[in-house]
């Protein structure tokens, strides 16, 4: 049996970080070796005890690069591929991803908010370093299926709008998942929603954000929600609606573990779970 995959989790004490740590601890082929979080007063505490799992003998640290450096050195003379799973904040995810690649640690990025320019920069940087990684807007297999169905339907409908709904602590809008869905639809058709009336918004933004293709994207933020997305197509006499609901974050864990297991064999960054399944 091969050695377990060393895994560092950034955003370890957050809701997604906690789910990831629980999944990693219970996966026989993974080993939690680092827990990064900047929550005040938690430095040096055992992450397992903080999350109510069990004592894991992995201390919480706020030193991101120090943790990556230590993990990188620990696997330098082995055939192991260390992995960083990042669920932090859009403001730091670019720097985190670039640092992981620089240290030879394979990034698995669940934090959304990277711009196309940043994503392109990271892809080129990872290719030069021959360090594989993955930026995954949504780890749900069900969402991948919705996106594929939306791309297929786009061939037949000229009118479509996308709505994503998340908890009110999500920092970015629209979600990376919603943007990715729109991008897949735009690969099939370059222009949507031909104008049939001269629209006027009495409240700016009422029609959502409009992409260059004409697709309208709407974002809702409310307590009680987890992650939900709807794509509605319209044509004379009918509508066609696709919807996916995540009701518990455990739905993401099969996709997270799949990505952890596959990034070590990649030679550059990939975007989207569909690239791995």
UniProtKB/Swiss-Prot annotation:
Keywords noted in UniProt? Amino-acid biosynthesis, Cytoplasm, Diaminopimelate biosynthesis, Lysine biosynthesis, NAD, NADP, Oxidoreductase
Q: Name the Gene Ontology molecular function terms of this record.
A: 4-hydroxy-tetrahydrodipicolinate reductase; NAD binding; NADP binding; oxidoreductase activity, acting on CH or CH2 groups, NAD or NADP as acceptor
Its Gene Ontology cellular component terms are:
cytosol
Query: Could you provide one GO biological process annotation from this protein's UniProt record?
Result: lysine biosynthetic process via diaminopimelate
Q: Which residues bind NAD(+)?
A: 11-16, 110-112
Where does it reside? Answer: Cytoplasm
- Supply the EC number(s): 1.17.1.8
Describe the reaction catalysed, as an equation.
(S)-2,3,4,5-tetrahydrodipicolinate + NAD(+) + H2O = (2S,4S)-4-hydroxy-2,3,4,5-tetrahydrodipicolinate + NADH + H(+); (S)-2,3,4,5-tetrahydrodipicolinate + NADP(+) + H2O = (2S,4S)-4-hydroxy-2,3,4,5-tetrahydrodipicolinate + NADPH + H(+)
Q: In which pathway does it act?
A: Amino-acid biosynthesis; L-lysine biosynthesis via DAP pathway; (S)-tetrahydrodipicolinate from L-aspartate: step 4/4
Q: Which PROSITE patterns match?
A: DAPB
- The active site annotation covers 166, 170
Q: Which PANTHER family does this entry report, sorted A to Z?
A: 4-HYDROXY-TETRAHYDRODIPICOLINATE REDUCTASE 1, CHLOROPLASTIC-RELATED, DIHYDRODIPICOLINATE REDUCTASE
Record family assignment: Belongs to the DapB family.
Q: Explain the purpose of this protein.
A: Catalyzes the conversion of 4-hydroxy-tetrahydrodipicolinate (HTPA) to tetrahydrodipicolinate.
Stated name of the protein:
4-hydroxy-tetrahydrodipicolinate reductase
Organism the protein comes from: Synechococcus sp. (strain CC9902)
Give the classification, highest ranks. Answer: Bacteria, Bacillati, Cyanobacteriota, Cyanophyceae, Synechococcales
Encoding gene, per UniProt annotation: dapB
């Amino acid at each position: 049996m091969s050695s377990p995959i060393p895994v560092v989790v950034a955003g370890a004490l957050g809701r997604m970080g906690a789910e990831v740590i629980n999944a990693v601890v219970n996966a026989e082929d993974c080993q939690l070796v680092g827990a990064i979080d900047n929550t005040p007063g938690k430095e040096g505490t055992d992450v397992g005890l903080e999350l109510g799992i069990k004592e894991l003998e992995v201390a919480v640290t706020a030193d991101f690069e120090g943790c990556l450096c230590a993990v990188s050195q620990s696997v330098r003379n082995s055939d192991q591929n260390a992995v960083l799973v990042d669920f932090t904040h859009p403001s730091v995810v670019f720097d985190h991803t670039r640092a992981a690649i620089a240290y030879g640690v394979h990034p698995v990025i669940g934090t959304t908010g990277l711009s196309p320019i940043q994503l392109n920069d990271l892809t080129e940087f990872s290719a030069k370093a021959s360090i594989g990684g993955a930026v995954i807007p949504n780890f749900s297999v069900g969402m991948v299926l919705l996106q594929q169905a939306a791309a297929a339907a786009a061939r037949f409908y000229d009118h479509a709008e996308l709505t994503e709904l998340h908890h009110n602590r999500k920092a970015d809008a629209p979600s990376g998942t919603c943007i990715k869905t729109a991008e897949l639809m735009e690969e099939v058709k370059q222009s949507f929603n031909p104008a049939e009336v001269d629209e006027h918004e009495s409240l700016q933004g009422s029609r959502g954000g409009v992409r260059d293709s004409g697709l309208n994207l709407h974002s809702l933020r409310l307590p009680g929600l987890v992650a939900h997305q709807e794509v509605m197509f319209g044509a004379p006499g009918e509508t066609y609606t696709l919807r996916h609901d995540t009701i518990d974050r455990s739905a993401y864990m099969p996709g997270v573990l799949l990505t952890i297991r596959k990034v070590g064999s990649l030679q550059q960054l990939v975007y989207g779970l569909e690239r791995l399944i």
